[in-house]
């Protein structure tokens, strides 16, 4: 339905109005039920055709407060001029915005939430800060060298014999050998001894005479077998506690080749699946003793060229042997000629008879060929 049922005249007639009940089929539209219950009211007077409605009239129920309190004359209300224009004063609608009922607390909120309190990071100690190792205080008897004296020693190195330098260099790897494996044992007494040893070695290195800068340094391109040997020759200490040294007593590992699990078959593999074996399509292939294919070809050739079959009929061979000449008389020669002519005529008659007899045979053969072709097509 184009109109809602509530606004139809048939539904509105229940209110006991004074409308004509014969006009029920016409969908009468009402804006208020009071128009039906109070009775028919006269329609509002419309303005002239020249005036254009820019504002609602006084009789309009939706005009709001403008119609009641407007003091302009009717001519000004119906005019289209700019000076007579007056904006509509619409009543403001009640806002649906909820009230702000939040009341901030006087005490400040805690920055650290309960989650942060429960899930704190673990108290992981610093690396190298072991509480079971007692920290050694520096001894007061150590001579403190001034910075100027250090610089002078760096620039002017004391001349020492080469034998003493070699002895100092030889002592270094021995001490390293002694302190290398002890770091792996977790006993506190051994760890304390390791710390003491390292401190002594560092003190020795600080007071050791440095080599002059003129000596050639071992680089990577010199082709030294091990970098550790080159460092030992130079006599420079490393920052690592345990310098890498390759193991000497370990035998080289022999590569073991695992046997392949796959064993290839000794016999020749037949590349034919079960599907190929079952679905070969042997009916289409001609067998050795089967002459069906040849016969079909012959039938097709006969169907296309049926004149070739008649040519296959053997013709009687005519003997054209010349008789021997006899010098006795002319009579036997004439007799021989007559015999040849008679034999030629007889052969012609036989050929005509054979051609007459072959015609019905050809018809029968052509019928058979047509039947076979029809069967082959089916």
UniProtKB/Swiss-Prot annotation:
* Stretches the record annotates as Mn 3: 237-260
Is Transport given among the entry's keywords? yes
Q: What is this protein called?
A: Microtubule-associated protein 6 homolog
Molecular function (Gene Ontology), one example = calmodulin binding
GO biological process terms, alphabetically, are:
dendrite morphogenesis; lysosome localization; microtubule cytoskeleton organization
Instruction: Identify the gene encoding this protein.
Output: map6
Positions with biased composition (Basic residues): 322-337
Q: Where is this region: Disordered?
A: 36-111, 203-378
Composition-biased stretches, type Basic and acidic residues, lie in 203-220, 242-252, 265-274, 306-315, 359-378
The UniProt function text for this chain reads: Involved in microtubule stabilization in many cell types, including neuronal cells. Specifically has microtubule cold stabilizing activity. Involved in dendrite morphogenesis and maintenance by regulating lysosomal trafficking.
Q: Which InterPro entries match?
A: MAP6
* Compositionally biased intervals (Polar residues): 52-62
**Start and end residues of each stretch annotated as Mn 2:** 112-135
Q: Which organism is it from?
A: Xenopus tropicalis
